[in-house]
Amino acid sequence: MGARADDYLSAHGYRPGSIQLIQKAYEEADNVDDFAAKLSDEGVVIAEGRYIYTLIRGD
């Protein structure tokens, strides 16, 4: 997913299973809103989901 995303997820205690879920959500998402909604369904705050999306994209 990239060094910035990996560092963020590690620093915030995301475990391998959660990281796999995030990767899958990113691969399946059409845009940032879709991605954030998918993560929200798993309990991630929308704003954090949007931020993670930008980290993965490298924005």
Predicted regions and their residues:
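Single-stranded nucleic-acid nicking/binding segments centered on His-rich, glycine/basic loops
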Residues: M1-D59
